[in-house]
């Protein structure tokens, strides 16, 4: 029999082993769909971003009007812009659900895969941040000013670092130019790290909802999971297109319809919704350096999760106490997101402080303690 080109060709062989003949556990649920959805999000963002970059001008006097020009005069420019802006939101929705799945089912015990995933999250956050500055509206400018200014809290080198990042003494033309360069570059860096992420995952194979070895029962990725992923894609595409076509500005800030003005500060400076949980944690500490450290810790804490796993069972499937804590953590993050969008006044200050405290408490002490308790209860 003639050799199958899919299995013998050096390039096709890699694709085949990753997406076609890949042995996959027979019982992975829809929670395992988000990896492929994230890949689709990245591809969409790169494509729409490339088309937008063709019409964008990275200059303070032209940036705002170039975006307006794209929406008004370019064929389907409004659609490309709406898909790109709302695609970012769906990218974050998918990555949050993907991380939540990892926490619930103990996927973080594949340490290399988990760590590359955390690096991907950080790179994505950086990309989204620099991208938000590009339309050069009021919230773009002031959001960029406030967040970059946080680096000045670093002792001794802080102020120098901020001025170096800005390319001057305030957010101005050099800042916009370099942010555009970074925003163009970073998605390709994300694509590269994604390949590494996938490579580490395929070393061990996927985890499954039971958290036990699935070597005894594997099925080929195609047609089973390729079809399942297409269904997941259709289910994501529906709300995504509904949002982008019916209310494209729902998640945006009205302030961004006003061109950037360094002389007028908006009443409430806040980032996009997907950063609000971290922003709430930053604001809950009445000290600049402390707030910056808490902000960094709120994401970097994910790197500690594999070391805080004390249960003898991998997943939370059969651990009701840990499940309760997990959903408490989810509710807590939703509260933080809401508080981050509110002004800094009573009662939001105290709610934010309590939610920030419980966020770290649940992750650092309650989950490991409850894991140990469940071991005892099961006579492990």
From Swiss-Prot:
It comes from the Eukaryota. Heme b b566 binds at residues 98, 197. One of its GO terms (cellular component) is respiratory chain complex III. CDD domains: cytochrome_b_C, Cytochrome_b_N. InterPro entries: Cyt_b/b6_C, Cyt_b/b6_C_sf, Cyt_b/b6_N, Cytb/b6-like_sf, Cytochrome_b, Cytochrome_b_C_euk/bac, Cytochrome_b_N_euk/bac, Di-haem_cyt_TM. The keyword Ribosomal protein does not apply. A ubiquinone binds at residue 202. It is a multi-pass membrane protein. Heme b b562 binds at residues 84, 183. GO terms for molecular function: metal ion binding; ubiquinol-cytochrome-c reductase activity. Keywords: Electron transport, Heme, Iron, Membrane, Metal-binding, Mitochondrion, Mitochondrion inner membrane, Respiratory chain, Transmembrane, Transmembrane helix, Transport, Ubiquinone. Binds 2 heme b groups non-covalently. One of its GO terms (biological process) is mitochondrial electron transport, ubiquinol to cytochrome c. The chain crosses the membrane at residues 34-54, 78-99, 114-134, 179-199, 227-247, 289-309, 321-341, 348-368. Pfam families: Cytochrom_B_C, Cytochrome_B. It is found in: Mitochondrion inner membrane. Component of the ubiquinol-cytochrome c reductase complex (complex III or cytochrome b-c1 complex) that is part of the mitochondrial respiratory chain. The b-c1 complex mediates electron transfer from ubiquinol to cytochrome c. Contributes to the generation of a proton gradient across the mitochondrial membrane that is then used for ATP synthesis. Belongs to the cytochrome b family. Heme 1 (or BL or b562) is low-potential and absorbs at about 562 nm, and heme 2 (or BH or b566) is high-potential and absorbs at about 566 nm. The cytochrome bc1 complex contains 11 subunits: 3 respiratory subunits (MT-CYB, CYC1 and UQCRFS1), 2 core proteins (UQCRC1 and UQCRC2) and 6 low-molecular weight proteins (UQCRH/QCR6, UQCRB/QCR7, UQCRQ/QCR8, UQCR10/QCR9, UQCR11/QCR10 and a cleavage product of UQCRFS1). This cytochrome bc1 complex then forms a dimer. This is Cytochrome b. The lineage of its organism: Eukaryota, Metazoa, Chordata, Craniata, Vertebrata. The gene is MT-CYB.
């Amino acid at each position: 029999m003639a050799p199958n080109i899919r299995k013998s060709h050096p390039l096709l062989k890699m694709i085949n082993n990753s997406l076609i003949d890949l042995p996959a556990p027979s019982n992975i649920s829809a929670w395992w769909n988000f990896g492929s959805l994230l890949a689709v999000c990245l591809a969409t963002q790169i494509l729409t971003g490339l088309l937008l970059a063709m019409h964008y001008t990275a200059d303070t006097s032209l940036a705002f009007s170039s975006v307006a020009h794209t929406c008004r005069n370019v064929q389907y420019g409004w659609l490309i812009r709406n898909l790109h802006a709302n695609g970012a939101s769906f990218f974050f929705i998918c990555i949050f659900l993907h991380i939540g799945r990892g926490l619930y089912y103990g996927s973080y015990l594949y340490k290399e895969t988990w760590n590359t995933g955390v690096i991907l999250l950080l790179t994505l956050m950086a990309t989204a941040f620099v991208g938000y500055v590009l339309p050069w509206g009021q919230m773009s400018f002031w959001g960029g000013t406030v967040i970059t200014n946080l680096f000045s809290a670093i002792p001794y080198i802080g102020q120098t670092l901020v001025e170096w990042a800005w390319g001057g003494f305030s957010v101005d033309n050099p800042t916009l130019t370099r942010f555009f360069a970074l925003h163009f570059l970073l998605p390709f860096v994300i694509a590269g790290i994604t390949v590494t992420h996938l490579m580490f995952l395929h070393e061990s194979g996927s985890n499954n909802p039971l958290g036990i070895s699935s070597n005894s029962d594997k099925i080929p990725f195609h047609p089973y999971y390729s079809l399942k992923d297409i269904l997941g894609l259709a289910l994501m595409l529906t709300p995504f297109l509904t949002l982008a076509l019916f209310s494209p500005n729902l998640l945006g800030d009205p302030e961004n319809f006003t061109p950037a003005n360094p002389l007028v500060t908006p009443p409430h400076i806040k980032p996009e919704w997907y950063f609000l949980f971290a922003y709430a944690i930053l604001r809950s500490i009445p000290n600049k350096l402390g707030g910056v450290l808490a902000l960094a810790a709120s994401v970097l804490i994910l790197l500690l999760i594999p070391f805080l796993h004390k249960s003898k069972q991998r997943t939370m499937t059969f651990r009701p106490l840990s499940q309760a804590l997990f959903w408490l953590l989810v509710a807590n993050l939703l509260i933080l997101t809401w508080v981050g969008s509110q002004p800094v006044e009573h009662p939001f200050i105290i709610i934010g402080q309590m939610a920030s405290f419980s966020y770290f408490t649940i992750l650092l002490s309650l989950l490991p303690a409850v894991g140990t308790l469940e071991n005892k209860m099961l006579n492990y």
